[in-house]
A protein has these predicted regions:
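Acidic/histidine-rich helix-loop elements
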Residues: 32, 57-65, 93-97, 179
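Serine-esterase "nucleophile elbow" of acetyl-processing enzymes
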Residues: 12-62, 72-80
């Protein structure tokens, strides 16, 4: 614990260190996991081991929707934030919100970031077929379209690396008992998948 606190403190005092806000829901927060095993700490360690000097700020809130993220954004954007990774939309999907609602909220988030000169990356969410093919297409298209419109770094979904290639279903061995949230191994798989994109995003900030 002492070592962990020292490392965090060392990161915090580096004036020239890039600081990234991870704006998301329970997946970002690290729901159901020990703090060290959550997405943000594991990604922090992955980036550090891959020669990327960055401090990740955990802005994940369990159950948060795109509207909740939008409402929290302003006070989370402290002057030292250099970039934001937006990973919202999963709870909109679970609640069956109209894709237009989700898109509008995300547009407001990225417009606000753009107006402040803050670069962003977006992690998409892929809809199942439960709501029908038209809903799925409209929802799935939101994220790549926004990435193109706002020039965002883009990851298609946290869950892509959790899919078993043989069954084409998410592997239950990578999920917690609730069948929704990733376990420790699931988080490791997610970080290995998204890490290179986030690394490139951070590298782009140093070139601005």
């Amino acid at each position: 614990m002492i070592i962990s606190l020292f490392v965090v403190s060392s990161f915090a005092i580096a004036d020239n260190q890039v600081k990234i806000l991870m704006l998301g829901d329970s997946l970002t927060q690290g729901y159901g996991l020990e703090e060290k095993s959550g997405l943000v700490p594991v990604l922090q360690r992955w980036l550090s081991s891959n020669e990327t000097d960055v401090l990740l700020i955990n802005g994940g809130v369990s159950g948060d929707t795109t509207l909740g993220g939008l409402e929290r954004l302003d006070w989370l954007l402290t002057p030292d934030i250099d970039g934001v990774v937006v990973a919202l939309g999963g709870n909109d999907l679970l609640r069956g919100f109209n894709p237009v609602f989700t898109k509008n909220n995300l547009e407001k988030i990225f417009t606000q970031l753009e107006s402040k000169g803050i670069s962003a990356a977006v992690v998409g969410t892929i809809s199942p077929l439960n709501y029908g093919p038209e809903f799925k297409k409209e929802f799935d298209d939101i994220f790549p379209a926004l990435a193109k419109e706002y020039g965002l770094f883009y990851v298609d979904s946290f869950f892509v690396p959790l899919v078993d290639k043989q069954t084409q279903q998410i592997s239950i061995n990578l999920l917690q008992n609730d069948g929704i949230h990733p376990n420790d191994k699931g988080v490791e798989a997610i970080v290995a998948y998204i890490g290179p994109v986030i690394k490139d995003f951070i590298k782009s900030l140093s070139q601005l």
